[in-house]
């Protein structure tokens, strides 16, 4: 598991930190994007509806059955900041490793 914690449905599999590689973390994220200039009220409504859908037990169970943990962001801005920080973090890693597109 490359996340910071074990996934409940795969509890026997240790995290990378538990397996001897502390500091390594990577989590896949699924989110929606909207065109630049989308009104904040529209973004807020989308966030509200998605958060509500992810709280429905049957929907949550479908995600969990695929080893995915629904974790809606606090707000559209929070998700955008998270994604920007991941681009910066992973970009630095790619540059440090000298990885080039082929």
Question: In which residue ranges do the predicted regions lie?
Answer:
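Conserved, function-defining micro-sites of small-solute handling proteins
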Residues: 1-102
């Amino acid at each position: 598991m490359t996340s910071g914690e074990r996934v409940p449905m795969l509890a026997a599999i240790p995290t990378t930190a538990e397996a001897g590689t502390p500091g390594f973390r990577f989590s896949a994220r699924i989110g929606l994007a909207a065109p630049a200039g989308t009104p904040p009220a529209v973004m807020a409504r989308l966030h509200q509806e998605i958060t509500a859908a992810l709280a429905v037990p049957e929907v949550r169970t479908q995600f969990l059955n695929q080893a995915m943990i629904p974790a809606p962001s606090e707000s559209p801005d929070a998700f955008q900041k998270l994604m920007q920080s991941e681009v910066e973090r992973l970009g630095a890693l790619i540059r440090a490793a000298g990885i080039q597109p082929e």
